[in-house]
Each structure stands twice: as structure tokens, then as C-alpha cells.
A protein has these predicted regions:
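Preference for long, well-ordered alpha-helical segments
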Residues: 98-153
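Amphipathic alpha-helices that form helix-helix packing interfaces
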Residues: 16, 23, 54, 61, ...
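Carboxylate-rich helix-loop segments that flank metal/cofactor sites and access channels
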Residues: 60-97, 101-110
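Charge-rich, acidic-biased intrinsically disordered regions
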Residues: 4, 41-42, 69-85, 126-134
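Secondary-structure edge/capping motif, primarily at the C-terminal ends of alpha-helices
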Residues: 30-35, 62-65, 90, 117-120, ...
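Conserved alpha-helical segments that form or flank metal/cofactor-binding pockets of metalloenzymes
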Residues: 40-76, 147
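Alpha-helical scaffold segments that form or flank carboxylate-/histidine-based iron centers
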Residues: 8-16, 38-57, 95-101, 125-137
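Alpha-helical bundle segments that constitute or directly flank the non-heme di-iron/ferroxidase center
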Residues: 3-36, 97-121
Length: 153
């Protein structure tokens, strides 16, 4: 692999890592603020833990490639969190609103992984790591989506 390709892979992995860190923060925030059953809190805590494990797997791949792993969330994630804090201060938080926001974040994360996988810029080993991470992302997305639709029923 040439240096340019390696740097592209590291950049892609770090972008995904930053977005996953945003996801961890989002799930932790949702668990702390949801008013519903402890089942929701437990689900969000479990997802935050799962996402943290995925973050670590992507960081390990960045290190294997000789890069410096991302250790903070994205600027967009921080901006989105400030918006949510302002929105919550104005409108209050309720379970449905929190779950809707979590699902929005999951949609965004799933799209980021799909874009990375469809790009054709990942080598075999790195692609395998990203595909494994994507399985976790897709599972979380589907679980939150089902939760949201269950509340609407």
C-alpha cells in the first residue's frame, strides 16, 4: 500500500472514530436524560459500551497502520450537542424526543459507515475491521429504530 492510500485509510478510520465517539456521548446523554423505564436507560448504556468497544477496534487499526488514533468527537457532533441542549432548555425533554434524536444520530452514523465501505478506498484488513464495526452500527440503528416505532404504535 502506498503512503497516500495508507493516509486515506487512517483519515477514514479517524473520521469514523470521531463519529462513533459522538455516538457514545449521545447514548450516555440519552441514558442520563430519559424519563421512561430503566429498560431504556439500560439499553442506551449498553449501546454506549458497545460503541466504545468499536471505537477501540478502529483505534487499534489506525495504530496498526502507523497513525495516531482520534480521541475526541467531531466538530459537527459537538455543534449538534449544543443545539440539543438549547432545544431541551426551550422545549423540555421527553422520552419520544430523546429517542427521535438518538435515531437521527444512528441514521447519520450508519450513512458514514456505508459511505466508507462503498468508497473502495479500504484495503482488505482495514475493510474487514470497518465491516465488523458496521455490523454493530447497523444492529444499534435497527434496535433504536424498532424502539422508536414501538413508541409510535
Amino acid at each position: 500500500m502506498n503512503e497516500h492510500s495508507r493516509q486515506d485509510e487512517i483519515s477514514t478510520l479517524n473520521t469514523l472514530t470521531a463519529t462513533l465517539i459522538d455516538s457514545v456521548t449521545g447514548f450516555e446523554d440519552a441514558a442520563a436524560n430519559i424519563e421512561g423505564t430503566s429498560r431504556f436507560q439500560q439499553l442506551f448504556r449498553e449501546r454506549a459500551g458497545e460503541r466504545q468497544r468499536v471505537v477501540e477496534s478502529l483505534r487499534a487499526e489506525v495504530r496498526r497502520l502507523g497513525g495516531d488514533p482520534e480521541d475526541s468527537g467531531s466538530f459537527l457532533g459537538k455543534s449538534h450537542q449544543r443545539f440539543l441542549d438549547l432545544k431541551a432548555a426551550i422545549t423540555g425533554r421527553n422520552d419520544k424526543a430523546i429517542i427521535n434524536e438518538v435515531e437521527r444520530g444512528e441514521d447519520y452514523l450508519k450513512e458514514k459507515f456505508e459511505t466508507a465501505l462503498e468508497s473502495g478506498h479500504l484495503s482488505g484488513e482495514t475493510r474487514a475491521v470497518v465491516e465488523q464495526a458496521y455490523q454493530s452500527v447497523r444492529s444499534g440503528h435497527d434496535q433504536v429504530s424498532a424502539l422508536k416505532h414501538g413508541l409510535e404504535a
